Curated annotation (Swiss-Prot):
Disulfide bonds join C21-C185, C104-C189. This is Trace amine-associated receptor 8c. Changing Y302A: Abolished trace-amine receptor activity. GO terms for cellular component: plasma membrane. Disruption phenotype: Mice lacking Taar2, Taar3, Taar4, Taar5, Taar6, Taar7a, Taar7b, Taar7d, Taar7e, Taar7f, Taar8a, Taar8b, Taar8c and Taar9 show no visible phenotype or behavioral deficits. They however show an absence of aversion to low concentrations of amines such as 2-phenylethylamine, isopentylamine, N-methylpiperidine and cadaverine. CDD domains: 7tmA_TAAR6_8_9 (cd15316).
Length: 344
């Protein structure tokens, strides 16, 4: 970061305060660019995920266990965009925390909770898609609204309990008190946890990721087999073309849903892997990562919260139609909730 500016005197976050952190701001050009890039990510995360939530909750055709999971995932990403990214943006660019120690703890707690909540949501969505594709006949009875509600509850409660334990009990700093004290200064909001909790954090990312990889590998194998069977059945039974054609459309829709959510999972892993590896390496190598590398890894993870609505808009025609209805104000009309979003 220091390579981007040149100042004859040392700058502090709080000039007239003892123990202030050193300020290492960017020069005006890069500073403006970073505010635009980070700000765009926050706005996209807020607006895009809000559109997803409104779409699922308003249109009755989208009231399904799977879509409730997607809406809950969008809620987590929305909260990242509105309560985490704006303040992290200021901290990253100004290299100072101007919002007080109490809000630093709350901000860090929300950061971890909402991000890990996204990971658990994606894991449960993978389970949902696995059942839908591999056992479609019993899927409606296996993955019900109540089951979806349980998955959503777990996806929120576990991350909130974990993050509260990390930032409000002090147990994550045991054994590294001297390091925490050395890094402590006025105007700083740096999260430092011991190796045990870093390993726990890594497992919270690694285990859901492995589950998702295994399930989606099986999903695409089964989907490929189903596609071949349906194609063979349709070509060999012309007399039942209408029925078989309907089955083919249903199977195709399920495969497309699995593919879309598979892209979402890949985007999550690509976005979060650099940060997760960096955090693990830092904990065991004495925090050797340069500040600018850490910021790149951190914002790569944050930007994942803005990606999902773009993925839905690209792959889901119903979401594009819902966006048009919302932005045009047509959802305010009577009976708009019964609009057929799947019509061609």
């Amino acid at each position: 970061m220091t390579s981007n500016f040149s100042q004859p005197a040392l700058q502090l976050c709080y000039e007239n305060t003892n123990g202030s952190c050193i300020k290492t701001p960017y020069s005006p050009g890069p500073r403006v660019i970073l505010y635009m890039v980070y700000g765009f990510g926050a706005v996209l995360a807020v607006c895009g995920n809000l559109l997803v939530v409104i779409s699922v909750l308003h249109f009755k055709q989208l009231h399904s266990p799977a879509n409730f999971l997607i809406a809950s995932l969008a809620s987590a990403d929305f909260l990242v965009g509105i309560s985490v990214m704006p303040f992290s943006m200021v901290r990253s660019i100004e290299s100072c925390w101007y919002f007080g120690d109490a809000f630093c703890s709350l901000h860090s707690c929300c950061d971890v909770a909402f991000c890990y909540s996204s990971a658990l949501h994606l894991c449960f969505i993978s389970v949902d898609r696995y059942i839908a594709v591999t056992d479609p006949l019993v899927y409606p009875t296996k993955f019900t609204v109540s089951v979806s509600g349980i998955c959503i509850s777990i996806s929120w409660i576990l991350p909130l309990v974990y993050s509260s334990a990390v930032f409000y009990t002090g147990i994550s700093a045991k054994g590294i008190e001297s390091l925490v004290s050395a890094l402590n200064c006025v105007g700083g909001c740096q999260v430092v946890v011991n190796q045990d909790w870093v390993l726990i954090s890594f497992l919270l990312f690694f285990i859901p990721t492995v589950v998702m990889i295994i399930l989606y590998s099986k999903i695409f194998l089964v989907a490929k087999q189903q596609a071949v069977k349906i194609e063979t059945s349709v070509s060999g039974n012309r007399g039942e073309s209408s029925s078989e054609s309907h089955k083919a459309r249903v199977a195709k829709r399920e495969r497309k849903a699995a593919k879309t959510l598979g892209v979402t999972v890949v985007a999550f892993m690509v976005s979060w892997l650099p940060y997760t590896i960096d955090a693990l390496v830092d904990a065991f190598m004495g925090f050797i990562t340069p500040a600018y590398v850490y910021e790149i890894c951190c914002w790569s993870a944050y930007y994942n919260s803005a990606m999902n609505p773009l993925i839905y808009a690209f792959f889901y025609p119903w979401f594009r139609k819902a966006i048009k209805l919302i932005l045009s104000g047509k959802i305010l009309k009577g009976h708009s909730s019964t609009t057929n979003l799947f019509s061609e």
